[in-house]
């Protein structure tokens, strides 16, 4: 099977990976959850080429995880905001980060600490 065909299979995992399985996509989504919205913010944070970033953002917009919202008319400039579909990926990213903290830390420093907005207590994502 070719990678282009993965999204056409009857497997939910494969269809999800067709959208999210690229090496930059989850990092772009992570940055969205951290409050980034603008192209230049993503590029400065990730160090990805403009062409690759534009492609990944377009794919996320096309898939429905992000929406492109104008914030300046001349020259035209856009922000990328999470949609309901995109927001639903938050627990997935938290679980992936938790897995990485547990299995891949290798003494590189303290993991990110998550704080519940409503009560202010620290928490660890669990499944």
Residues of each region from the PLM?
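Basic, amphipathic "hinge/linker" alpha-helix immediately C-terminal to the N-terminal HTH DNA-binding motif
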Residues: 21, 72-95
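Extended, folded domain segments that form the structural surfaces/walls around functional sites
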Residues: 29, 37-42, 57, 92, ...
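Short aromatic/hydrophobic contact patches that present stacked aromatics
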Residues: 45, 79-81, 115
